[in-house]
């Protein structure tokens, strides 16, 4: 599965400021920047982010997904500290 497709699915279905996907061979990770999602419990965050991607788990296009969530403010701070683009 292409990284851009994962990003686009999440952008189209969730209220997020930014999303970044990485990985290959059905093992992916996403960084989701959203005040709304970051405010949820960790379990709710996972459920919310997994939901639009579930069809791709069923087909095997995605086997594993790691999730990191940030508020907009925390992402700005961490990105500056870690020199993310």
From Swiss-Prot:
Pfam families the UniProt entry points to: BolA
Disulfide feature: none
Family membership noted in the UniProt record: Belongs to the BolA/IbaG family.
Stated name of the protein: Uncharacterized protein HI_1082
UniProt source species: Haemophilus influenzae (strain ATCC 51907 / DSM 11121 / KW20 / Rd)
Classification of source organism: Bacteria, Pseudomonadati, Pseudomonadota, Gammaproteobacteria, Pasteurellales
């Amino acid at each position: 599965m292409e990284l851009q497709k994962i990003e686009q699915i999440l952008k189209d279905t969730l209220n997020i400021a930014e999303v970044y996907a990485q990985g290959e061979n059905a093992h992916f990770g996403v960084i989701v920047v959203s005040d709304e999602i970051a405010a949820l419990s960790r379990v709710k965050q996972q459920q919310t982010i997994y939901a639009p991607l579930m069809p791709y788990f069923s087909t095997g296009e995605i086997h594993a997904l790691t999730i990191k969530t940030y508020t907009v403010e925390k992402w700005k701070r961490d990105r500056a500290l870690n020199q993310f683009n």
